[in-house]
């Protein structure tokens, strides 16, 4: 596994599967975040497939997040206490969102009540 910072987001890169997981950042994230479907590190492309546990925990100034359709799991407490997070967008369909593995309390204490998908909204 490789730890890398790419365009302001922290990732854990798996060299065997060529996948990437978004991980926590020391000083947290803020504002509007767009997670890309793929990231490139040392000329190797990795597909972003997960948001790690605690990745955005206590990011009180995070206001919106765009999640690519390549994400298949969101870790426990990933968005815990993101008190300003009002807008979650998933770049896939509602059916794809419902297939994502959502770990315990992934969105605990966030004001967002729906995930906006390409074909409608899913209540959370």
Give each language-model segment a name.
Residues 1-6:
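N-terminal low-complexity, Pro/Thr/Ser-rich intrinsically disordered segments
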Residues 8-10, 15-19, 28-50, 59-73, ...:
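Structural signature of tandem-repeat unit edges
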Residues 24-26:
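Acidic, Ser/Thr
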Residues 53-55, 75-80:
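Consensus positions within tandem repeat domains that build extended binding/scaffold surfaces
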Residues 80, 100-105:
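A structural signal for leucine-rich repeat
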Residues 106-111:
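Short mixed-charge
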